[in-house]
């Protein structure tokens, strides 16, 4: 077991523009961290820096309390699993898993023991003599993981390993990865653009945007208390409703640009009169009535999802999505009366986009 530390690391391709801005991350022994963000946010570049495949411009990387910033990849004690399985087509499953150990000069008996144990963990025992072309996508990905496991690394690095699989296989492999981590307890850094993978696999999530770590926290923390407008809009499906407006002069209500006024749960007097963005998740909006002081929304569209439904409407020019129970199926053009609980409202600074 070993920890991983990134200390103020940066990356610049041209010496001027930083594609990774100063970033610090401490990963505890045995912790599973997922880096999630849109394409081009820097997550794969950061992973390659940890692996030693990209040079660190400034800052340091530590693995198992050893500074590895200038070390060759083979000396860092890491093993990578990629999006592409990169299996040798002419080799059997057993030979693919053993190859890395063989070229390092490990003895035949020790190699056989490690391959046998990895195959047992990954339920590949009956497939060891098969070639990659005889395997399904999920089985090939397990072989790629087995090749990493036999190395007994200090840190696993996963670069979007499930993105080539179909939806059903991705669900299965997510469960297998969770079970694998519980069994091995190896420190892991995992890259994905898929927020479902991030939320289900991670002990902590690092949400990245434009080379910056917007927020680092548990899946529950980043979902329930997003640190910025970006995190609020990226995490959650459908995304959090974000509504522009201002805090009234008394700091007691939020005035939407569409003329709707919503009560605030106190503590916002210091923001009186300021432009802000209000956020609320679709599932936190409750149906109410006009008599109960509900806020009206004319529904444009209803998405029927099976377990629940999504009602889409507008307040002025601003879109609003409401998650409804599966038996609630209003028709387009009907008016919904809504209650937005004060304790479920989020406020973000109108200039910085940061949570207040």
UniProtKB/Swiss-Prot annotation:
UniProt keyword list: ATP-binding, Cell inner membrane, Cell membrane, Membrane, Nucleotide-binding, Sugar transport, Translocase, Transport
Q: Which reaction does it catalyse?
A: sn-glycerol 3-phosphate(out) + ATP + H2O = sn-glycerol 3-phosphate(in) + ADP + phosphate + H(+)
- InterPro entries noted in UniProt: AAA+_ATPase, ABC_transporter-like_ATP-bd, ABC_transporter-like_CS, ABC_transpr_MalK-like, ABC_transpr_MalK/UgpC-like, Mo/tungstate-bd_C_term_dom, NA-bd_OB-fold, OB_MalK-like
Ranges for domain ABC transporter: 4-235
Where does this one sit in the cell? Cell inner membrane
Provide the GO MF annotations for this entry.
ABC-type glycerol-3-phosphate transporter activity; ATP binding; ATP hydrolysis activity
Tagged with keyword Cell inner membrane? yes
Q: Does the keyword Translocase apply?
A: yes
Task: Tell me the residue numbers annotated for binding ATP.
Answer: 37-44
Top-tier EC class: translocase
Sorted alphabetically, the Gene Ontology cellular component annotations on this record are: ATP-binding cassette (ABC) transporter complex, substrate-binding subunit-containing
Q: What is its EC number?
A: 7.6.2.10
Write out the function statement from the record: Part of the ABC transporter complex UgpBAEC involved in sn-glycerol-3-phosphate (G3P) import. Responsible for energy coupling to the transport system.
Similarity section: Belongs to the ABC transporter superfamily. sn-glycerol-3-phosphate importer (TC 3.A.1.1.3) family.
Tell me, how does this one assemble? The complex is composed of two ATP-binding proteins (UgpC), two transmembrane proteins (UgpA and UgpE) and a solute-binding protein (UgpB).
* Protein name (record): sn-glycerol-3-phosphate import ATP-binding protein UgpC
Gene name, Swiss-Prot/TrEMBL: ugpC
């Amino acid at each position: 077991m070993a920890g991983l530390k990134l200390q103020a690391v940066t990356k610049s391709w041209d010496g001027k523009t930083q594609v990774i801005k100063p970033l610090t991350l401490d990963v505890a022994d045995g912790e599973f961290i997922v880096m999630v963000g849109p394409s081009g946010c820097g997550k794969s570049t950061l992973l390659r820096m940890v692996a030693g495949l990209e040079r660190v411009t400034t800052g340091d990387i530590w693995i198992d309390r050893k500074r590895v910033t200038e070390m060759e990849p083979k000396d860092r004690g890491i093993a990578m699993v990629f999006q592409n399985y990169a299996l040798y087509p002419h080799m059997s499953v057993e030979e693919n898993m053993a190859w890395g150990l063989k070229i390092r000069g490990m003895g035949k008996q020790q190699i056989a023991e490690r391959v046998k144990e990895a195959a047992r963990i990954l339920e590949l025992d009956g497939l060891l003599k098969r070639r990659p072309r005889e395997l399904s996508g999920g089985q090939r990905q397990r072989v790629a993981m087995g090749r990493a496991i036999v190395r007994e690394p200090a840190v696993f690095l996963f670069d979007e390993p499930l993105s080539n699989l179909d939806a059903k296989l991705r669900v299965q492999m997510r469960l297998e990865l969770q079970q694998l981590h519980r069994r091995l307890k190896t420190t892991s850094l995992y890259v994905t653009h898929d927020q479902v993978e991030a939320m289900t696999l991670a002990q902590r999530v690092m949400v990245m945007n434009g080379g910056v770590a917007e927020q680092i926290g548990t899946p529950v923390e980043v979902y329930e208390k997003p640190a910025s407008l970006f995190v609020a809009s990226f995490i959650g499906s459908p995304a959090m409703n974000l509504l522009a407006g201002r805090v009234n002069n008394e700091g007691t209500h939020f005035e939407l640009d569409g003329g709707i006024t919503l009560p605030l749960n106190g503590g916002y007097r210091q923001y009186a009169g300021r432009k802000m963005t209000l956020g609320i998740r679709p599932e936190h909006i409750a149906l109410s009535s006009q008599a109960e002081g509900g806020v009206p929304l004319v529904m444009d569209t209803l998405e029927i999802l099976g377990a629940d439904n999504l009602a889409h409407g507008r307040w002025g020019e601003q879109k609003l999505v409401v998650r409804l129970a599966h038996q609630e199926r209003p028709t387009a053009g009907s008016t919904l009366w809504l209650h937005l609980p004060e304790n479920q409202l989020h406020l973000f600074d109108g200039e910085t986009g940061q949570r207040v």
